Every structure is written in C-alpha cells, then in structure tokens.
Amino acid sequence: DEHGDSLAFTGSINESLTAWKNNFERFKVFLSWDRPRDVEEEQEAFDRLWENAEPGWATVNLPEAVKQDLIKYAPNEPPTVEPGLGPVVEESIKSRWIAQFLRDAPYLVQDGWKVGVETAALDPFPHQRSVAYDVLSQFPCKKLLADEVGLGKTIEVGLILRSLLLSGRINNCLLLVPRSLVKQWQEELRDKFLVDAPFYDGSKFVYFEGNTTRSEPLPSGRDPWRVHRVTLASAQMAKMSGRSEALLNSGEWDLVILDEAHHARRRDFATLNRYRPNRLLRLMEGLTERTKALLLMTATPMQVHPIEVYDLLRLLGLPEKWQDPHSFMEYITSLRETDDTTWGTVFSLLDSSIEHWGVDKSWEESCGRALGPVGRQRILNAIDFGNTSAVYSFKDSEREWLRQLMRRQQPVPWMTYRSTRPLLRQYFDQGLLKQN
C-alpha cells in the first residue's frame, strides 16, 4: 500500500464436500509489520515460480500454453479420488473435537500456555512442572537450569518449548547441544512433546528414526538457520570459525537454548583482569544480544572457579552493579562470614539486587517474625542509605539476618533453578517414584 506495508498468504480454503470430509485445510496470513521475514520468504518463493526458476516446476505464460496446446494433457474425466490416497478411515467426532480443542485452547483461555504442559505425553515431577510454569509466566526471560544430573532438565525444557510453540508465543528457536546428545534430544522432543527439531549438521537436515536416519537437503537460496521453527545443532559445529559468524548474522531469535552450558567458559582463571573467552562463550555473548529469551542448562555451573558462574549469569543479564567481576567476587567471598567483609561493596550490590528484584519475600516474612518490623527495617534502611557503620551496632541476631539476606539476594537464586538428588528420596517417600 502507500505506506509500504504488505501481506502474504499461503494455503487454501477448500470448501468442497471432499475437503470437508477428507482434507486438512490450512490458511496462513503474514503481515509485513509483524513478521516481515515470512512475507519476504513467500515473495521469494512466488518469484522463483513466476520466473521459472524453481527446480521441478515449469511456468508457462498463457499464450505459450495455448500455442503448445497444453490442455491436451488434461484427463478427459476429472479424478474422483486423488492419486495415492487409500480408503478414508473415519475417526470419531470426539477425537477430532479434542484435537481441534488442543490447537485452539491456548488462544481461548487465560494462561492458555499451560495447555502445552498439561497435554505432554508424560506426567512431570512437581519441580519440573514448577520450573516450566515459572519460566512461562515470566517469558520472555533468561534463566539458568541447574538441576543435578537425573532431575530432568531436558523434561523442563521440553515442557517449556512445547507450550511456547503450541501457544504461538515463539516463531523460532535455536537449540545447541553436544554432538553426542543430538539424537537423544531429537527423539525425546518428538516422542514426549511432539516437537519436531530437525538436526542441522552444516550441510543438510537430519532426522533420526530409530536405527535409521533420513536426510533433507538445504533449500536453495535460504538461510539454513531460518528454515524450521526449531533448529537443533551441535555446539561444536556452531562455534567453528565461519559457522559462528553465519549464525550471528542470521538474525534475531525468540528463544536460544544451550545444553551443557558449562562448556562456555573463559580460558584461564589466574587473573580477572585478563578475559579470554573460549569460542563457545564468545558465540553465546553474541547470541544473548540477538535473542529475546535464553535458557542455559548445566548440572555443574562451577567446575573450577566461582567466576565461571559469573560468566554464565552475565549472559542472562546481571543487574548493572553486579556486572563488574571484581565486585561479584568480593561479594561471593563475603558470604563466607569472614571478619574482613567489604561492607561498602556488599551494600552497593545488595541495594542493586533489591532494586532489580525486590526483597526476597521469604526472608522478609521470616525476619519480620524473628526481629519484628522495626528490626527488619533497620537492616533494610542501612542497605538503602549505604550506612555501613550501622553493621557494627547491629545485634548478633540482626547481623545473622543480614547474612541470610546476603545469601538470598545474590543473583544465583533469582536467575537459577536447582533441584538436588535428595528430592528424589522425597518423591520415593511420597509414592511418586516406584523405585529408589
């Protein structure tokens, strides 16, 4: 139109008797001001057909078609049954209603994104459902999933991804995993969550089907990172020179997921003044600027040095005052309850944390019961006004509650989900696990 806006549509709305009884009809409309890339792709596909440049298709203008008498190739009688179709198997009306409801429900009810969690082909543990709900209620967000091995981080991500796709809250997702886990990821997403995640190996798309594989060539003229809604790739391939640049230049993402995120790390820890990220960490620094949401997965966020945790949290978006690695490490050191606590740094970072996330509700309630509202407010006022000298006039009980606040207000509890193996024992005791 006069404003440069356009729309594109694909599909058909066939209202014949055959279509109503036998077909699945789909009609999609894309708006340039909402999904410009989709409009561009439809335009490019049409142009290839129109210009006779699409492999396997021939485009002939009408005068030429008349001249060649192409109509003679049409059958004398219209087909009554489409070639290749077997007998139509009638399905129950109830099943069709249920299937249609699952497609429509996320758009019809409040918190419709829960439909994806509750209709997955498994019954998640309480902590898995809790993580999925929390991420989905905050989406788009950037979080670290750090459950211990065996607690189901993959299940949590599958629930989240299924819900986001079913509710239309994301249009694209990049999933980076170790090469050795690609097959497991693809099969688990398909079998448990009905999420199709083609594996892009750098030259083609691969589908694992039991003991066999099926390959799909890359479409000509299209960015391979933008062909499918969910793209599964190995982190090893993505971080390679040349590959990483192409990935970073491919555009914005709605969601990026990195499994075994602890492999994104700096090369040495001898001094904080020398920052040398490895290729994966450098890639993730670029991707976090190009995605609305980010999920990092690792059971071991710290392997050698606490600065490894800082590097992962920085990808998720630390509050401003926490972004300095020296201040971060000073604060972490202060949690050990030593006599040389740098209260100026601690109060500055605490104030930044409270401003960013608010006061931890559990601490606020428990401290209020233990010290009363006046004692609790003495602690909060000292932090708010940066009155570090007040610490030395605190009672022992007030100082202990200050220490508890320091532990709860650091970024890790706010940005990380972590469940540990003793939780499995609780599930066993509650009858949620059949064997220990």
Where are these regions (language model features)?
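Signature of lipid phosphatidyltransferase scaffolds
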Residues: E2-G84
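Charged, low-complexity
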Residues: A53-K143, H228-V230, A235, G251-D254
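SF2 helicase/translocase NTPase motor core
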Residues: Y107-H127, Y133, T154-E156, R162-G286, ...
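Walker A/P-loop
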Residues: P140-I160
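Short hydrophobic/aromatic beta-strand immediately N-terminal to the Walker A/P-loop
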Residues: K143-A146, L174, L295
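Conserved helicase ATPase motor motifs in RecA-like P-loop NTPase domains
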Residues: T288-H305
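A short helix-turn-beta junction within AAA+ P-loop NTPase domains corresponding to the substrate/partner-engaging
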Residues: V309-W322
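Conserved helicase/translocase motor-coupling segment
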Residues: I379-N436
